[in-house]
Every structure is written in structure tokens, then in C-alpha cells.
Amino acid sequence: MDRLRVGLLLLFLCPFLVVAKEVKLASPNKVLHAEVSIDEHVSIRVLQNKDVLFAVRNIYLNTDQGYIPEKSSKVRSVKTKAVDRMVVPEIKEKRSVIAERYNELSFLFADKTKLEIRLYDEGMAYRMLTNRKGELTIFDEAADFVFAPSSTVFFQQDSNMNSDYEAPYVEQKIQDIKQGVTGNYPALVKIPSGTNILLLESDLQDYPCLWLEKGSQNLNAHFWNYPKTYNVNGNSKNRRQIVACEDYIAKTSGKRTFPWRVFAVAQEDKDLMDNQLVYLLAPECQIEDPSWIKPGWVTFDWWARRGLYNVDFKAGINTATAKYMIDFAADFGIRYFLFDDGWTYKEDLTKTIAGLDMKEVVDYATSKGVDVMLWVTYDLFDNQMDAALAQFSEWGIKGLKIDFINRSDQEASNFYWKAAKKAAEYKMVLDFHGAYRPDGLRRAYPNVLTREALVEFEQNGGTYKDNPDNRLMLPFIRNVAGPMDYIPGTMNNATKGSFRFNHDTPMGQGTRAHFMAMAVIAESPMQMLPDPQSDYYREAECTKFLVDIPVEWDDLVTLDSKIGDYVAMARRNGNSWYVAAVTDWTSREMKLELSFLPKGKKYKMEVFRDGINADIRAIDYKHEFIEVEGGEILNVSLAPGGGWVAKISTL
């Protein structure tokens, strides 16, 4: 559980106001300000000092019991609260201790609805709390997000209720987006002044995900309705796709809290990467003793079984191949081996295909200090959850990759919580694929180590989507919501001109040093290795450094970075710092200041950087050891699609 240090708590009551005029709230550092007005509906305006950043207008629920809060609702009371505490996360995604400081306004309306608004130094969040008897049918949740029309939006535009959430980011001015265009969260808005506002949500339970829809002028809240009928004729990968919907978005308890609507604010691009509002606004850990949860690296067989060489067995989904991959994991200290798609007998998760003895494989892995994970589909796993988990536990399975959820309605969001809770009962970790973005579930159930919801490395098998331009948006947008399963570290590297599609052995668009650096930049307590194990044996020098990069961190320092162009950061694990920088297809000279180290103190630095010919052959790299001093400024040269990564240790 989080260990808290709770600071000042202030309360005041304003009894039975007929109409609440504008109420103001300031962030702890008094830079951000919120002005709340209640007329026909609630509106919130957010300012940075005296400059308006954005507004949220017409906040209400449309339900079978009318509007909540009621139109022109009377306010019974207003309370304020100030919190200053330190939160210790179960899994150290960014740092070992998180500072949480906010000021809160809480409105109680005559219909017993509450509206809570929090201002952090890093942004604003609001949510509703209802107090109704019985069940509540919600037809829609309204909110108009008002930004300057010339503001630029970065988000995944999508019109599919069965979305896989793997679209590249589209960069477009609000005024140029056509009315009716929809897209999913997180969405980044850069207003004309250059300030960034990242739209997120947290504590999503028993409710659909929030999307965006372009209205006549503004961005509006959009939700997918509850499913009525499904595709019943497909396979287990698409059988739960929605064909028709009900006329409501949710049926839920009338007495509940609703998800937090989150707006992260950052003056500089680099500050987005350090924002943790989604985590802080999520429910606290629900697992009594989470000490069994083990983050780590994963090697898996999806591409690898089609790319092995220098072996004396027929590669495939079989016991011999699995043991070879487990030996590789043991040789390099990798925690997990994952069986991906293909290991099950037909559509029965309790049985394996011929030639694969799961119990023998797991026992062998255990003897080598390696844990085994299994890939499953949403449809099969949801139907067989109890029987499957019992069988997996008997085999000794330690984790699951759950794929092809491809939905964000209320029923689907409930599945995430159900799967996390049931997996925790069997002490199994989870990785969601075909999944919507993180929403705080990982704080309540830290066995949810990572998830997809991005254009990740596998897209290189048949598209150009995972290019450095899109990839360098991820740390500022997708990764702010929570861990992302990008799958870094390919040894099959290509320049922009040499890149080709190859589904069985995909190439990565960028240099060797770029993809090694992505293991520091792409934040995830579970990192996957994409390539065949044979390739990693061949490139042992790179492999050893790569898989020694931690997946948990004690501290983060963001360095000079620009959305979509270049990223630089330093992360600390124990006494070691890892520093990484990557660029888009533009070659770049960067200066990295070691200001996070004590000035003048000497350190040893191990570096992997772009080789002199990396612009021609992306596999070209230079490995060297250098002595550096705290406060020193390093000159770093990056090839097109290039990278630089270093480990800094005490002498």
C-alpha cells in the first residue's frame, strides 16, 4: 500500500446558495488557476497566471433520471481541501517516491451530486460523484473542451468502435479538423503560446472510455454505446467485435464515483514526460501483499520461431524450441519467456498443441530461473477464465499477454478489472494488447505491468507506421498515461532508404543505438525483445548491455526534448544512471548536461552510439568507455534515426 504523509486539510461551508457565482481555486505553486461557474450547467476555466489555457463547458450526465447535476442546480455547500504527501508506488515506473500536492474544491448540489475539482502544479482534474438509489442508465456524458481554434492537436484519429488503438498520431489544428471526426485518448493540445495540455483519464471503472469528437467549433466528449450484438461467426480474435449497440453508454450503480477527467499542463515539452497525474488519481493498491509481482525483460517466440538459425532442431511451437529460448533467457538474466499465438489446441486454453509439453517446459524454465507467460485472446480467456487460470496455475505459469480486446465500451472496461483481479488471485502478471490506453488500473492492480495502445515495433512487419517521427511522439503522449509495450531493442536496423517489410523478421526504422536507447526512453516495467534469440547471441555485446537496462527506476531527469523531433532523458536505478537520446530522421548535434550528478565528481561511462557510417548502415555502432565528471556537458552526434545510450557508474 502507498505510504502517505498527509498535509494541511481545510474545510469551509457555504450553505444553500441559490446560484453559485464564480468560485476560484489555485494550484499549490499559485501558477495554475481554475474559475468554476455554475449557470445552466457547470463550466471550468483554467488559467496559467493570467493567461487562459482552456475551458471545459457544459459538464453533466444525461440519464434516465434527468440531467446530473440538474439544470441550474442549487449548490448546498462548497468545501476546499489541500493535500501535500509522498506516495510510494508498488512498481517504480518513474521514481521510487512521488510527490502529490493539490488543492481541491468540492461542490455539493441540491440533488446530492458532488463535483470535485483538483488543481496540481502539473494540471487539473475533475470528476462527478452521484448519490442515487438503484441503477442509473447513462445515455451520455457531456463536456465541451474549449481551446483556441488555432491550437494544434496530436491524437489517434479513429472512427472504429472495435479499434485496436494502433493508429499513428495525427497533428492538426482544431479549426482544420472536420466536424464529426473522432479519436481516442490521450490527446495532446499545444495552444498558440506553446503550452501543452494533455487530455487523459483515470479511475475508469464500470464505464466506457472517453474519446474526443470534433463539434462545430470545439472538441467534445465522445463515448461508444454499450454493445447489443457481436460478430459471432469469426475466430477468437474477432468474435467479440461489436455489430450493434444499445442507446446508452452505461448502466451502473446510482451511488458511485465517476472517472477523473485529467488535463496535464506543461510549459515545456520535456515536462510532459514527468507527469504522473493518471497514477496519482487512481485507486490505491487492492492487492494485500503485492511483493510477488516481478517486473522484467521478456523473450518470446512470435517472430523468433520463424527466424532461428545455428540450432539442431526444427524451430516452431514445440518443446525443443521453447527450451532453447529459455536457455537464452537464463544466459542473459532475462526473467520471462512468453509463448505467443499458436500454443493452444484449437480454442481450448487448457490444452496445448501436439509436440508441446507445457509442464515439461515450465519445469525446465523453473530450473533455469526463468518464468513462463502465455498469450491468450480476450474472447477465449473471458469465456474460460476460471478453468484456464486453474490449469495455468497447475502448469506453473506466471503471467499472461491478453490480446484482441479491441474495444473501449463499458463491458470491455469491466473485463480489464475482472482479469486483473483474477490474475492477481493466481499471482500472475499481465500485459494487455489490442488494448485501450492506461487509465490507472495498474495502481489498483500492479500486476498489470504494461499494455499496448500504440504503434509499436510489430508494425514494421507490414507498415511504415513505426517510424521515428511517430515514435518520438510516444514519450510525450502515450507514455504519460502509463507503461507502454513498445518492444525496443531490435538488432535488425534500417535507414529510411533501406527499410523493407518482412513480416517474419521485421526490421526497425532507425539505428542500432536508437533502438537500444529506446529501452531507456520507452517506459515499461515489462520490456519485450523482438528478435530471434540467434540474433541476440550473434550480437552479444549489445544484448548484454540492453537486457541489463533496468525496468524500474528511482529517479527521472528529463533533458532537452521536442515532441516528434528528439528526446533526451536520464534515469537512475540505485547508484547507476542511464542517459539516452534519440532523434527523428533528421541528424542532430545535442548537448547533454550531466547536471544531475554532483559537480566535479568523476564517473565511468559505458556508451553505445551511432557509428560513423550509421547513416548508410543502421547497424553501425560504436561501443566505448569514457571517464566523465558531474556537471560536464557532453556533445552527442546522432545520425538520421539515430540514438545514444550510456550507463554512468561510480569509479
Give the ranges of each region predicted by the language model.
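An acidic-aromatic substrate-binding cleft motif
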Residues: 249-328, 332
